[in-house]
Curated annotation (Swiss-Prot):
HAMAP family: Cyt_deam (MF_01558). CDD domains: cytidine_deaminase (cd01283). This is Cytidine deaminase. Homodimer. The lineage of its organism: Bacteria, Pseudomonadati, Pseudomonadota, Gammaproteobacteria, Enterobacterales.
């Protein structure tokens, strides 16, 4: 079991501990539960889906990286496939506060970058901030997404974001988590190709500036993140954050990164290079390359 889970795991009910122990035994537990695993946990504990998600939130929050605030937020995004995806907030010392990742963004990106097609619900241990409510409004589940908070009745996103502004106001038809492929040729080594493939999946209807980041760890594992724009612009999630979300949730740490590649257009209206390289250097990675999409 990864050390970060030990304290939260010890506080779970005995029957949930017993059912989870073989799942968490792998140091690189992927921070997700398949539909089959969810069903097994429900049977072992007698909990319904909502109660189980709440019970698992401490494990999601244990994935938080909060050296600045020490305020850990956990989220679980429930995919329509039946898979549940953990997420947690992340802060980066030496970078800017704008690089921060919120727990809801983490769980949603985890689902999206894992190939999930849509979300049915999201469970969070603290009420979503306005930034996250706006981020969620970019999803193809839209204002119907169910939000579950401890001690409250579940409500749809529309209840948390009245008079919402979103992609439909800008006549955007393709939404976040819809399948997209921008068709750029995969060239170069495996890491470059992973970055280009991530750029091909970008959701960037506002700037038309595709980008993707791929991180290579010392053991050869590669984590890729795609750019995810938002109708309100500021809640946009850069591609580096997507890759860092996966790296963190899958049990790796920043010193594990040995090389990074950013893929983007040289003449795009928005450029990720400066922010990407600055944040990576703050995290200790100095082997950073840029490949141009063609």
């Amino acid at each position: 079991m990864h050390p970060r889970f030990q304290t939260a795991f010890a506080q779970l009910a005995d029957n949930l501990q017993s059912a989870l122990e073989p799942i968490l035994a792998d140091k690189y537990f992927p921070a997700l539960l398949t539909g089959e695993q969810v069903s097994s946990l429900k049977s072992a504990t007698g909990l319904d889906e909502d109660a189980l998600a709440f019970a698992l939130l401490p494990l999601a929050a244990a994935c938080a990286r909060t050296p600045l605030s020490n305020f850990n937020v956990g989220a679980i995004a429930r995919g329509v496939s039946g898979t549940w995806y953990f997420g947690a907030n992340m802060e980066f010392i030496g970078a800017t506060m704008q690089q921060t990742v919120h727990a809801e963004q983490s769980a949603i990106s985890h689902a999206w970058l894992s190939g999930e097609k849509a979300l049915a619900a999201i469970t969070v241990n603290y009420t979503p901030c306005g930034h996250c409510r706006q981020f969620m409004n970019e999803l193809n589940s839209g204002l119907d997404l169910r939000i579950h908070l401890p001690g409250r009745e579940a409500h749809a996103l529309r209840d948390y974001l009245p008079d919402a502004f979103g992609p439909k106001d800008l006549e955007i038809k393709t939404l976040l988590m819809d399948e997209q492929d921008h068709g750029y040729a995969l060239t170069g080594d495996a890491l470059s190709q992973a970055a280009i493939a991530a750029a091909n999946r970008s959701h960037m209807p506002y700037s038309k500036s595709p980008s993707g980041v791929a991180l290579e760890c010392k053991d050869g594992r590669i984590f890729s993140g795609s750019y995810a724009e938002n109708a309100a612009f500021n809640p946009t999630l850069p591609p580096l954050q997507g890759a860092l979300i996966l790296l963190n949730l899958k049990g790796y740490d920043y010193p594990d990164i040995q090389r990074a590649v950013l893929a983007e257009n040289a003449d795009a209206p928005l450029i990720q290079w400066d922010a990407t390289s600055a944040t990576l250097k703050a995290l200790g990675c100095h082997s950073i390359d840029r490949v141009l999409l063609a």
